[in-house]
Amino acid sequence: MRGSSITLEDYTLEEGLRIFRDAGFDTIEMWRPQLRRCKTDELRKKFVAYAKGMGILMGGLNVVGEDYYQPFGTDQQLEQTLTNLMADADFALSLGTRDVLIWEGVAPKGTTEAHWMSQLLPRLIELFRTATNALRSKGVRFLVEPHPFTVGMSDQFLIKLCDALDPGQFGITFDFCHYGVGRPNDYLEAIPALGHRIRNIHFSDTDQKTSELHFPPGAGRLQIQAMLEAFRGIHYDGTLALDLYAYPTPVQALPLGAARVREACEFLGLPY
């Protein structure tokens, strides 16, 4: 069963791994800031061995929100974004995982979807095409995670981005909370629209008002069962991770969340 380490951002690595293990999780998506002390490849390998000894495997590297990621800035910022994205890919590989979780980009203030399509989409395609081509032999995959304030909340934008890239190296992380806030009236419709491009789910709930506040599934306002039915309708066969980022009592909520993950995976026919 898969979880997201950012859920326990206030805990040490050792504490977080123990809490996840005791709640029944065996695979974790690691948030990069929590690995700030793993400065060398050797230290990262030691951390991975420590986690494995506790029964925890690495399920991806989450670098969403890193300051370097400025694909819509100057040409120099775009180049720096590429350089750091490649470095994060190597970081992920040193953990023994191929997946780099990133966001596609914050929408510049005052811009429209038409501007995103004509001016920003080509830059993103160039960025990820260059990165995936360079990393093809290493098997790295980028999974972009739309947020309520990013350009990927537009299905049209996200579909064109995905379809311009190798599906074996690029896909979507569909976060229940983000879509519930960013698309409060039509989040269900986004699932069949994006379809096979979705390769990872961040399973959570939301009050549909507060951005980034991930409730345990079933504790918010989303139509969770209808969303799962939509995923079954597209024959979803990717991964699913519990994400309780910003929830005030994550340790208390983990067992309930774990039960909901098991139910969701059984419903979708996914391993857990």
What residues fall within each predicted segment?
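Histidine-acidic metal/acid-base catalytic patches
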Residues: 1, 7-24, 96, 155-174, ...
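Active-site beta-loop-alpha junctions enriched in small/polar residues
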Residues: 4-8, 31-35, 63-66, 105-107, ...
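Active-site acidic/histidine proton-transfer and metal-coordination neighborhood
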Residues: 12-15, 52-53, 70-171
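Flexible, glycine- and charge-enriched loops at secondary-structure boundaries
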Residues: 13, 37-44, 74-82, 113-121, ...
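Hydrophobic residues within beta-strands of alpha/beta enzymes
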Residues: 28-29, 59-61, 100-101, 201, ...
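Glycine-rich, proline-tolerant flexible connector loops at the mouths of alpha/beta enzymes
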Residues: 29-52, 107-108
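Catalytic-core regions built around general acid/base machinery
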Residues: 42-53, 124-135, 190, 226-230
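A short acidic, helix-capping loop that chelates divalent metal ions and anchors anionic groups
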Residues: 67-73, 108-115, 180-182, 209-214, ...
